[in-house]
């Protein structure tokens, strides 16, 4: 008798190196818990439909639970000749409970079996990712609440542009993550569907009840089309996309953390616990965790591209190409979960150097727009005001001074509308307090923003 579950019509066994190429057990053993969960539901339904006996069902379920326990205790050895987690479990089950184990696959194919495992896995992991995003958002909000009045330079083109609230800046990432969170939540409608019972592609002649297994596995609905059930990998692509976009947002934040921690900026100080040193330069303190998060976005987006290319030319229904849907998915899930945990810890333990930030906004021209707005308030056309301020900035650069250092006499030479009150107008803290528009960096607007964010988290 052939050692293969499908070996009946074959006269030759594959060589070991062919088995090595064909096998997926090295990575799809990740799905053992989901495979056992799906098989227990399937066996329960088979017994309830009088397709197998209650005794056989009990033997199957007890055997599956023993296999699961042995796996987690490191007592289970898998065989590559058995290809994947599904056939390894089935083989082990038959060894333990005899013919009853051979009845488990009644009315089921590996095609709907693996699809069920993947739906269960993705559902579980997406829910955990949502929790991790919420936890990270809570850390961002807590940091922002402590720095509403902390002023920093805002940037465009990596050039200092306008003074902004540190809280306003970091809250930008809160809202990016909120969009990420909502995408994961919305994707659950396309993840939480049961393919079990679709069999290979056309359903089964056995009197199974697909809605019973749907309920046992706590899926919201079942696929309406058996071909679609076994061939659909849209939910994996969608999950990989959502992971990739979240990682891109984390990468952008990580880049800012890296810049802020440089000797040139010194805006923040990272905890030693989230930094490393150099093997040759003893003075170094490197932001390696932030750099790793920035670097890992490449593998996440790469896995998305790989899955898109894998799926693009596949005819219905199942093809072996779909074995390639797992490694990238598993790695992307590990990557985003690890990145979110690390980033939260890094944010919770870093120090914001408020004195340095305050010093910085008093030694730049980020208040130049304020001077232009000041002139506009004095009935100077904006384009004329823009030109006047540009000339003043050029003179300041030539003299090594800033706008607050320019004598009133010189201001009046440039435009007689400028009075003593210009100096209060140009102070960075006043630049912020005048920002009254909804969603702006003004302290009142930021405090309102924080209340909206806090309410959102509390009502989730």
Swiss-Prot record:
Keywords: Amino-acid biosynthesis, Arginine biosynthesis, Cytoplasm, Lyase. It catalyses: 2-(N(omega)-L-arginino)succinate = fumarate + L-arginine. One of its GO terms (biological process) is arginine biosynthetic process via ornithine. Pathway: Amino-acid biosynthesis; L-arginine biosynthesis; L-arginine from L-ornithine and carbamoyl phosphate: step 3/3. InterPro entries: Arg_succ_lyase_C, Argininosuccinate_lyase, Fumarase/histidase_N, Fumarate_lyase_CS, Fumarate_lyase_fam, Fumarate_lyase_N, L-Aspartase-like. It comes from the Bacteria. Its main location: cytoplasm. CDD domains: Argininosuccinate_lyase. It is an enzyme of class 4 (lyase). It holds the Pfam family Lyase_1. GO terms for molecular function: argininosuccinate lyase activity. It is found in: Cytoplasm. Its EC number is 4.3.2.1. Coiled coil: none annotated. GO terms for cellular component: cytosol. Belongs to the lyase 1 family. Argininosuccinate lyase subfamily. This is Argininosuccinate lyase. It comes from Staphylococcus haemolyticus (strain JCSC1435). The gene is argH.
């Amino acid at each position: 008798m052939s050692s293969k579950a499908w070996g009946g019509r074959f006269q030759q066994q594959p060589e070991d190196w062919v088995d090595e190429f064909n096998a997926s057990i090295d990575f799809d053993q990740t799905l053992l818990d989901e495979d056992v969960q799906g098989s227990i539901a399937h066996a329960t339904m088979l017994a309830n439909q009088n397709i197998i006996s209650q005794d056989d069902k009990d033997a199957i379920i007890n055997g599956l639970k023993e296999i699961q326990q042995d796996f987690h205790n490191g007592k289970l050895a898998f065989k590559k000749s058995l290809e994947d987690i599904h056939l390894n479990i089935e083989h082990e089950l038959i060894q333990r409970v005899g013919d009853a184990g051979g009845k488990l696959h009644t009315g089921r194919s590996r095609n709907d079996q693996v699809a069920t495992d993947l739906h269960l896995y993705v559902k579980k992991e997406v829910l955990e990712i949502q929790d991790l995003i919420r936890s990270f958002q809570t850390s961002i909000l807590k940091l922002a609440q402590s720095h509403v009045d902390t002023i920093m330079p805002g940037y465009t083109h990596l050039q200092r542009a306008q003074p902004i609230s540190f809280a306003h800046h970091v809250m930008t990432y809160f809202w990016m993550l909120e969009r990420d969170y909502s995408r994961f939540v919305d994707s659950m409608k396309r993840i939480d569907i049961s393919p079990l019972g679709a069999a290979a592609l056309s359903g089964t002649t056995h009197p199974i009840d697909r809605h019973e297994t749907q309920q046992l596995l706590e899926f919201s609905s079942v696929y309406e089309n058996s071909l679609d059930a076994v061939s659909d990998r849209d939910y994996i692509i969608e999950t990989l996309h959502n992971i990739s976009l979240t990682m891109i947002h984390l990468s952008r934040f990580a880049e800012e953390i890296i810049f802020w921690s440089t000797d040139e900026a010194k805006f923040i100080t990272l905890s030693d616990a989230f930094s490393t040193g150099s093997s040759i330069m003893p003075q170094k303190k490197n932001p390696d965790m932030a750099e790793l998060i920035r670097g890992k976005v490449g593998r996440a987006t790469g896995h998305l591209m790989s899955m898109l290319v894998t799926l693009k030319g596949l005819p219905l229904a199942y093809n072996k190409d779909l074995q390639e849907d797992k490694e990238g998915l598993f790695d992307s899930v590990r990557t985003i979960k690890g990145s979110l945990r690390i980033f939260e810890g890094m944010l919770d333990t870093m120090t914001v150097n408020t004195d340095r930030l305050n010093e910085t906004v008093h030694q730049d021209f980020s208040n130049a727009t304020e001077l232009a707005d000041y002139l506009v308030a004095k009935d100077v056309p904006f384009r004329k005001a823009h030109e006047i301020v540009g000339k003043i900035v050029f003179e300041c650069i030539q003299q090594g001074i800033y706008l607050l250092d320019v004598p009133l006499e010189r201001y009046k030479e440039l435009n007689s509308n400028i009075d003593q009150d210009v100096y209060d107008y140009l102070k960075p803290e006043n630049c912020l307090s005048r920002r009254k528009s909804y969603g702006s960096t003004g302290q009142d607007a930021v405090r309102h923003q924080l209340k909206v964010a806090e309410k959102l988290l509390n009502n989730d």
